[in-house]
Amino acid sequence: MKVLATSFVLGSLGLAFYLPLVVTTPKTLAIPEKLQEAVGKVIINATTCTVTCGLGYKEETVCEVGPDGVRRKCQTRRLECLTNWICGMLHFTILIGKEFELSCLSSDILEFGQEAFRFTWRLARGVISTDDEVFKPFQANSHFVKFKYAQEYDSGTYRCDVQLVKNLRLVKRLYFGLRVLPPNLVNLNFHQSLTEDQKLIDEGLEVNLDSYSKPHHPKWKKKVASALGIGIAIGVVGGVLVRIVLCALRGGLQQ
């Protein structure tokens, strides 16, 4: 009985695997003549978006491909693309009274034309942040915000939203972190802190970097270093003299 039961189970399993193959596998696969002659358009090449954020362009090459696999009537077309509409934050530090400008205008917008976009500005005054809750509307309808005489009150984060006029689609958001400082608070003369070689490189000249030159130090730093050195030397000498006097007095008292 056990042998018969085992044989029955194995036979059933074999039939279960074999039957679908018999039913679903045709002897010949007939393709209609119209389908054999069909021609389709296929994208054979595509470039990446011209920008990493905001609205840009990409190019696609489309060809007609027939049953023989030959490409015909190939055309290259230019399409809009949007990889990411959030473009991060740019940081700026300027002095009080300086003229300065923040601009949303970039190469991708120039490609389409400025009139195709709507610009909306918001401001988080006094803080550097990307938290939407701290922003308030800022009156500026153009692609830029200009400060004729920047003041500390102008410090904060400016957010520029760029939308397509035709459908109000948001295609770009850019943050500007602006710090306005008084001139006596910090020295922003970057060129002064460069070495002689770095200054030449900054001017576009070729320099042999194997020859090292010491960075420029302001005169007041040299004076402070000299004063500290003299003060330390006087302190050491004075300490030695005081110790000698104390030792002499102690020896006299003992006698």
UniProtKB/Swiss-Prot annotation:
The intrachain disulfides are 104-160
Q: Which UniProt keywords apply?
A: Cell membrane, Disulfide bond, Glycoprotein, Immunoglobulin domain, Membrane, Signal, Transmembrane, Transmembrane helix
Annotated Gene Ontology cellular components are: plasma membrane
The membrane topology noted for this protein in its Swiss-Prot or TrEMBL record is: Single-pass type I membrane protein
Origin, by domain of life? Eukaryota
What tissues is it present in?
Highly expressed in sperm (at protein level).
Q: Where in the cell is it found?
A: Cell membrane
In this chain the Ig-like domain maps to: 83-171
Q: Which residues lie on this side of the membrane: Extracellular?
A: 31-226
Q: What functional role does this protein have? A: Essential fertilization factor required for male fertility. Part of a conserved trimeric sperm complex with the essential fertilization factors IZUMO1 and SPACA6 which bridges sperm and oocyte membranes during fertilization by binding to IZUMO1R/JUNO on the oocyte.
Assembly information from the UniProt record: Forms a complex with IZUMO1 and SPACA6 on spermatocyte cell membrane required for fertilization.
Q: What is this protein called?
A: Transmembrane protein 81
List the source organism: Homo sapiens (Human)
